[in-house]
Swiss-Prot record:
Lipid modification (N-myristoyl glycine), residues: G2
Name used for this protein in its record: ADP-ribosylation factor 6
UniProt cross-references to PANTHER family, sorted A to Z: ADP RIBOSYLATION FACTOR-RELATED
Domain of life, source organism: Eukaryota
Family: Belongs to the small GTPase superfamily. Arf family.
Lineage of origin: Eukaryota, Fungi, Dikarya, Ascomycota, Taphrinomycotina
Amino acid sequence: MGNSLFKGFSKPFSRLFSNKEMRILMLGLDAAGKTTILYKLKLNQSVVTIPTVGFNVETVTYKNIKFNVWDVGGQDKIRPLWRHYFTGTKGLIFVVDSADSNRISEARQELHRIISDREMRDCLLLVLANKQDLPGALSPAQITDVLQLDKLKDRLWNVQPTCALTGDGLLEGLAWLSQNAKLK
């Protein structure tokens, strides 16, 4: 009898204390810093990267949430394939090179194309305004303005200033995702 009583309690307790999972898609133009961010979060190290052809996927645990992060290459020839990764995505991390003002309108077009897809309708949007350590980097307020995020209705979004090389701002981004996640 005692054993069956324990079994009845073990399932709710395991759900209470186990890690929840959240599928995250990390996109952005090539050379924005996506892969550097992924491995800074995973290994807490800066790694030398090459342009991603295809994808990298890693699990990053933060405050008992397992973020399954899919980092997909950002070269223009690869971008049409992004939609194949949309299914099941709960959060979009869109990485912007804040110091590359020449490509910010291209980044805006790609972001709005992604979030207008019906499969991405309900996902959280975290914009990482990366490379804040570089001269001339746009501020989070400027990124918000240029990406026209204020026009987004019925979507939770946040702009987090980051520096992938030092890790500045990355954990704050995960904290925002974990606080706003609708985990099942």
